[in-house]
Amino acid sequence: MKSLASPPCLRLIPTAHRQLNSRQSSSACYIHGGSSVNKSNNLSFSSSTSGFASPLAVEKELRSSFVQTAAVRHVTGSLIRGEGLRFAIVVARFNEVVTKLLLEGAIETFKKYSVREEDIEVIWVPGSFEIGVVAQNLGKSGKFHAVLCIGAVIRGDTTHYDAVANSAASGVLSASINSGVPCIFGVLTCEDMDQALNRSGGKAGNKGAETALTALEMASLFEHHLK
């Protein structure tokens, strides 16, 4: 006669449920053959939330403890150390009424954060599709700490919009990876001209200015911490 195999033993590690007045427990609950054996009185697998900290509260507490650990080193770029950093801005001429406003927002932001005019170079290309290859060339030149990529793609009656928008995004990403220099994506992809104008100095702000802030932080991060 074949002997019956004993049912598997599963080990469940509790991650979120714990009592408010108890410390984090390292105990586990074992399930064997369909019956559970609780190894600690401090654990509960009840569906009731009464008397227990929420999973989000537990996660927040654990994350806070991790962040406060003295041995952890946190590194970030600075927005107050723009002096000496050099930037290239690749701008698409297509939809120029929008891209000029984005460019103005970027340059004004650079000046606000102490980047000198002589450390900013603007390169115009026909459209957003052509941005990637130029950005990669500029990144590899070794002259710039970051490259801004500015354009505006607005949906029309055909699928041309999707092709250009996707190609522009992948082109900028490839330029950044292949050159090792931050190439910042500042190409608007909008449903209509109103959306584009709202994002180039209108009620939704100026995305060119936001792109410049990203470029400043990334350039500072690479220059001062990642060399």
Swiss-Prot record:
Q: Which InterPro entries does this chain map to?
A: DMRL_synthase_chloroplast (IPR017420), LS (IPR034964), LS/RS (IPR002180), LS/RS_sf (IPR036467)
* Any single Pfam family the record assigns to this protein: DMRL_synthase
**First and last residues of the transit peptide:** 1-71
Q: Spell out the SUPFAM superfamilies in the cross-references.
A: Lumazine synthase
Pathway named in the protein's UniProt entry: Cofactor biosynthesis; riboflavin biosynthesis; riboflavin from 2-hydroxy-3-oxobutyl phosphate and 5-amino-6-(D-ribitylamino)uracil: step 1/2
Query: Active site: which residues?
Result: H160
Please give the catalytic activity noted in the UniProt record: (2S)-2-hydroxy-3-oxobutyl phosphate + 5-amino-6-(D-ribitylamino)uracil = 6,7-dimethyl-8-(1-D-ribityl)lumazine + phosphate + 2 H2O + H(+)
Query: How is the quaternary structure described?
Result: Oligomer forming an icosahedral capsid.
UniProt record similarity statement:
Belongs to the DMRL synthase family.
Q: Can you name this protein?
A: 6,7-dimethyl-8-ribityllumazine synthase, chloroplastic
* Origin species: Arabidopsis thaliana
Q: What is the lineage of its organism?
A: Eukaryota, Viridiplantae, Streptophyta, Embryophyta, Tracheophyta
